[in-house]
């Protein structure tokens, strides 16, 4: 994105943050590195440039990884999983697909390399989503927290005057919901016209 902006002479500023490869699994209760399972992590694009002559992914090495994240991973998932399996990864390896990670409408589907594509289809998982592969996915059962927030999955319209709504909006987000601000009220002071 930055290259595109630079090429088109558009000024920009980059604000660093936590990559979705770490934040999204954390919101789903999946510790991508866990001392009992893995000390390393592989982050891979789910789809390479289609005009490349050959893949730059070393599938043989990747299939030995204990924790893999595919960013933008749903479109080519079956093809990518077949490459991992044909290079020695067990078809029973746990896998999670997370759509809309960190948002009030986050959806997580669990499975293994063999059945995840059908589960993704059944649950209508589409982009934006990421894929996590490895035994770390098993921790979700005990560590999921975001979906347990009281307003998770709720979209709430806040009609208060904008200057009075910030604390309510903040509480909605803190509790897992999404606030839509539509101020229908405006508060003004009344001027006393009596003499």
Tell me what each language-model feature is.
Residues 16-20, 72-76, 163:
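Short beta->alpha linker loops
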Residues 8, 64-66, 175:
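Structured helix-beta-strand junction loops
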Residues 1-48:
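Short glycine-cluster motifs
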Residues 2-3, 38-40, 44-160, 169:
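A contiguous loop/helix-start segment that scaffolds small-molecule binding in enzyme catalytic cores
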Residues 91-92, 149-195:
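Surface-exposed, charge/polar-rich loops and edge strands
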Residues 22-25, 52-54, 105-108, 189-194:
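Short, charged, surface-exposed secondary-structure boundary motifs
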Residues 12-17, 34-35, 70, 97, ...:
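General beta-strand structural signal in soluble alpha/beta enzymes
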């Amino acid at each position: 994105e930055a290259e595109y902006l630079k090429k088109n002479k558009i000024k920009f500023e980059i604000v660093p943050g936590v990559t979705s490869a770490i934040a999204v699994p954390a919101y789903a209760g999946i510790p991508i590195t866990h001392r009992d399972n893995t000390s390393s992590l592989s982050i891979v694009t789910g789809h390479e440039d289609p005009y490349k002559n050959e893949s730059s992914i070393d599938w043989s090495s990747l299939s030995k990884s204990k924790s893999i994240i595919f960013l933008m991973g749903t479109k080519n998932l079956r093809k990518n999983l077949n490459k991992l399996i044909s290079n020695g990864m067990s078809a029973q390896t746990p896998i999670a697909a997370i759509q809309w990670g960190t948002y009030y409408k986050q959806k997580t589907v669990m499975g293994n390399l063999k059945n995840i594509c059908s589960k993704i289809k059944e649950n209508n998982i589409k982009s934006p989503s990421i894929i996590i592969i490895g035994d770390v996915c098993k921790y979700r059962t005990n560590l999921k927290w975001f979906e347990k927030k009281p307003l998770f999955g709720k979209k709430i319209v806040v009609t208060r005057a904008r200057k009075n709504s910030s604390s309510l909006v903040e509480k909605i987000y803190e509790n897992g919901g999404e606030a839509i601000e539509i101020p229908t009220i405006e508060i003004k002071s009344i001027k006393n016209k009596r003499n």
